[in-house]
């Protein structure tokens, strides 16, 4: 099977929850190791029968987790429950978790920015450290705890289980094997710049978003260069859109376009890129030919309005993901909410209460605190990072 087909298959699996042999990527999320938390309290709910999926516990007091709501997967149940600690459910701790992705093994992987680690969260809500050492910042390749990162922000997974990480504080792109071995793929640690060319000669500046297309190309939101970069399968780096150092907002082709601190990027099956243009509070689209247009929001207008794309408003949206139907979900960080952009371009709020920066778990609307990472699971559910937690979200249909 070709690498292109494998890449396409991974994206299909991530967005549809199909099975191949014994591999099930249909993952919904377990709450607190057998319990469900409401608000910041914890309700111990023991059950003695199997569920269709270990990430789908029942709600205490009736109903099921397939009902719209917000569920805890792992992390502390209070605003000050930080730190970095392996453990199960609410016993685990995260320190500024940001990017999140569903791997081909059915586990979630999280870039833990403040601790400088990559964490793995099982379908049972057990969090372990895959690579890096909490609190030990630096840039070292190596296996597991011997590796060092400096503010890893987002990550992507391929069909083989390799992770691609934007090591933002080092201005590099790192690769993590399924076993936790870390190598530097592109850029040079501590050298913020903008240079195309071979991976070793290329330079980035605080890159944050990263995505993988069906042809095996990586695309990077090079945040402080205000550009979109591509790393092809030969590890050659090129600039796709924007101009290094030119913060602004302009639609157009390639170098005629302008971004301002783009923080995340996602690609659909047709090769269109979607960018969370955070400082502009807009969502942008980049066509395969490099044509950039604004999909939703208005540059420089931070707000909460739902509605048609041009009428909608976001506030420092920092992350996005796309499902198999082409629906975009946006982690609207400054508003503390998850927004949906349908095929018509209409924007709606599907999780959280815009303007309320607080985590309240349970039935919708609930609320979130500065969600910074989001990924698609199966059957219409999402996983997100918010505050110091990893959450499962079931938007209203």
Whereabouts are the PLM-identified features?
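Bacterial Sec-dependent N-terminal signal peptides
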Residues: 2-5, 10, 22, 26-69
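Gly/Pro-rich loop segments of beta-rich domains
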Residues: 62-98, 126-153, 181-208, 236-263, ...
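Residue-level detector of Asp-centered blade-edge/turn motifs that repeat once per structural unit
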Residues: 102-105, 157-160, 212-215, 267-270, ...
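Conserved beta-propeller blade signature
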Residues: 107-109, 162-164, 217-219, 272-274, ...
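Short loop/turn segments immediately following the C-termini of beta-strands
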Residues: 113, 168, 223, 278, ...
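A short loop-to-beta-strand structural motif that recurs across blades of beta-propeller domains
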Residues: 116-120, 126, 171-175, 181, ...
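A generic tandem-repeat structural signature
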Residues: 151-156, 167
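Blade-level signature of beta-propeller repeat domains, shared across WD40, Kelch, NHL, RCC1
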Residues: 370-397
């Amino acid at each position: 099977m070709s690498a292109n087909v494998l890449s396409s298959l991974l994206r299909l699996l991530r967005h549809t929850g199909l099975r191949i042999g014994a591999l099930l990527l249909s993952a919904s999320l377990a709450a607190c190791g057998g319990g469900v938390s409401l608000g910041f309290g914890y309700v111990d709910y023991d059950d003695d029968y199997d569920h269709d999926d270990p990430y789908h516990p029942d709600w205490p007091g009736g109903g099921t987790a397939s009902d719209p709501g917000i569920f805890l997967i792992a992390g502390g149940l209070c605003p000050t429950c930080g730190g970095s600690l392996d453990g199960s459910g609410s016993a685990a701790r995260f320190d500024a978790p940001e990017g999140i992705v569903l791997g081909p093994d059915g586990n979630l992987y999280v870039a833990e920015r403040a601790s400088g680690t990559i964490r793995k969260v099982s379908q049972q809500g057990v969090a372990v450290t895959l690579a890096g050492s909490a609190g030990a910042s630096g840039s070292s390749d190596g296996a597991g705890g011997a590796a060092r990162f400096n503010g890893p922000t987002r990550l992507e997974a391929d069909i083989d289980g390799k992770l691609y990480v934007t090591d933002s504080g080092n201005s590099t792109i790192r690769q993590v094997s399924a076993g936790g071995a870390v190598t530097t793929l592109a850029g040079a640690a501590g050298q913020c710049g903008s240079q195309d060319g071979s991976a070793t000669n290329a330079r980035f500046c605080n890159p944050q978003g990263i995505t993988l297309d069906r042809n095996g190309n990586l695309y990077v939101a090079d945040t402080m260069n205000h550009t979109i970069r591509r790393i092809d399968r030969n590890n050659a780096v090129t600039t796709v859109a924007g101009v290094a150092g030119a913060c602004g907002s302009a639609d157009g082709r390639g170098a005629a376009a302008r971004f301002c601190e783009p923080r995340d990027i996602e690609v659909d099956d047709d090769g269109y890129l979607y960018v969370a243009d955070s400082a502009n509070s807009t969502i942008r689209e980049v066509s395969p030919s490099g044509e950039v247009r604004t999909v939703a929001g208005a540059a420089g207008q931070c707000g909460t309005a739902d509605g048609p794309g041009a009428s909608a408003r976001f506030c420092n949206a920092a992350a996005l993901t796309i499902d198999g139907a082409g629906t975009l979900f946006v982690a609207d960080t400054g508003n503390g909410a998850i927004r949906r952009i349908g095929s018509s371009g209409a924007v709606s709020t599907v999780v959280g209460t815009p303007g309320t920066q607080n985590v309240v778990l349970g039935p919708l609307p609930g609320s979130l605190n500065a969600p910074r990472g989001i990924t698609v699971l199966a059957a219409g559910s999402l996983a997100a990072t918010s505050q110091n937690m990893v959450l499962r979200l079931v938007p209203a249909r």
